[in-house]
Amino acid sequence: MGPTEDPTADLILLTQQEALLRFDSFDPDTAWKLGNLLHAALLARNAGGTVEIECDGQLLFACTTPSAKPTQGDWIRRKRNTVRLLHRSSYAIGREIARDGATLESAHGLSEIDYAAHGGGFPLWLRTHSSALDATDVCVGSITLSGLPQRDDHNLVATAIADLLNIRIPHLSAAI
């Protein structure tokens, strides 16, 4: 099985990423730095994309690249909704339902009109203790990107967060 065919193997890596990619603090300056990393990464790929970062319901960063499509705003909204409700990356939710042969509707009672289980949405976690695996950490927002194939959307967000935090993370192999 190739990397995109094995949801269980992907979920192991995604769970590790989600445990590691947590902030000690997050403010508008942090959002600006992270958003600009994502914007620069899209431009380096000559990709049309949209980026949004929100915390506690407040929009802290939003941008598009020149060739972004108008529909990407709706993808951002749907991925953000998924992350904010389920506190997992939108790609992890997609891999879970692929593994289980389910849909958003059957697994979570969610309509695809308002939710998306596609890569690019990532939870914004704040640590409340020193351990990255501490169950009392709090999901306070989302970091969302749309414009690339979903696996690449996810990888770009996870890589940018890791770069900003200056940590190494396990990576999913690139989309095939």
Predicted regions and their residues:
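Structured interaction and signal-relay segments at domain junctions
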Residues: 43-110
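Intrinsically disordered, low-complexity terminal regulatory regions
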Residues: 1-72
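Amphipathic, alpha-helical segments enriched in basic
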Residues: 6-13, 17, 28, 99, ...
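Short, solvent-exposed cationic patches
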Residues: 84-85, 155-176
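Ordered alpha/beta subdomains of enzyme catalytic regions
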Residues: 19, 80-82, 148
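Short, positively charged
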Residues: 29-32, 97-107, 166-170, 174
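Extended hydrophobic
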Residues: 105-165
